[in-house]
Amino acid sequence: GVNRRGNIFKLITALKQICNHPYQFLKSGETSKELSGKAEKCVSLVQSILDNNEKTLIFTQYKEMGDLLTKILCEECGSEPSFFHGSLTVPQREHLIEDFQNNDDRKVMILSLKAGGTGLNLTSATNVIHYDLWWNPAVEEQATDRTYRIGQDKNVMVHRLITLGTFEEKIDEMLKAKKELADLAVYEGEK
């Protein structure tokens, strides 16, 4: 019953953390990007985005992963990204948004998916990276929509990082089916 579901959820969470970076699961050890294909891909994407003098938002559902990405990107790219998360005060959040939107030197903002999901206008970003998958595709879309506000005049590239050969591929298939069903329900309801 409930106990079994709790154990399954813990297992899934552990597997997701391992896909993100082994350090997130182990809570100790090396934090090198080389230990995670996903971290390596994220760094490569961010470096390419920076080379094009563009800005990016990186969404993760885990604050610990945001902390780790901040460390890795600082080491690999030479500048510290902003990190917008639920523990920040309202003035701190407002400052981060203002700085990201108006400071040409501030190119990367990491956001915890829940904290960065509603009411934000981050149209200076031309790239969105979803580092890990959320169970509800609408939450992911809402996060992406931060860049599609009034005033956005550029194309926005959305990158979803999924570790090949893992259960993340199955989660992605499930999410796509769930989204198709939701889209169909909306379409049918509009008739």
Predicted regions span which residues?
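Conserved Helicase C-terminal RecA-like lobe
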Residues: 1-120, 190-191
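SF2 helicase/translocase ATPase core recognition
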Residues: 80, 92, 107-190
